[in-house]
């Protein structure tokens, strides 16, 4: 587990965890603003895994469902917080027409294609450059 911090304008960015998955580095970042609200995101599936916001009394509480560790997000988990794409929902018979062209997609839900196909965005490891976080 590695932990590094970087201040970007009004946010504190902390790399909380990092592990190797299929030859790539999967990382977990915590971003906290000056008011104390925090989110955690991972570059695996561009997933939002934690949000802490104040309640009516100003007490910060988690407000989204999440899994216990970064490792639990890998593979075919329930897609909690993941980015859906290149499309969401099912495409019947895994094909669609655009103009006069018929496009055939991966079948990953019986005869249909769902949530980006076999290797949708939720299963991608995205590159992270924290210099772009403002």
Please place each PLM-identified region on the residue numbering.
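Surface-exposed acidic/polar loop and edge beta-strand patches at domain peripheries
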Residues: 4-134
């Amino acid at each position: 587990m590695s932990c590094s911090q970087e201040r970007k304008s009004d946010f504190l960015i902390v790399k909380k965890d990092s592990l190797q998955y299929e030859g790539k580095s999967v990382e977990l970042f915590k971003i906290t603003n000056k008011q104390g609200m925090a989110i955690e995101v991972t570059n695996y599936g561009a997933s939002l895994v934690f949000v802490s916001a104040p309640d009516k009394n100003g007490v910060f509480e988690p407000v989204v469902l999440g899994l216990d560790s970064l490792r639990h997000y890998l593979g075919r988990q329930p897609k909690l917080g993941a980015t859906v794409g290149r499309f969401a929902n099912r495409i019947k018979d895994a094909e669609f027409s655009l103009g006069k062209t018929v496009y055939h997609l991966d079948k990953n839900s019986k005869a249909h294609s769902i949530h980006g196909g076999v290797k949708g965005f939720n299963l991608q490891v995205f590159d992270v450059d924290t210099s772009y976080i403002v």
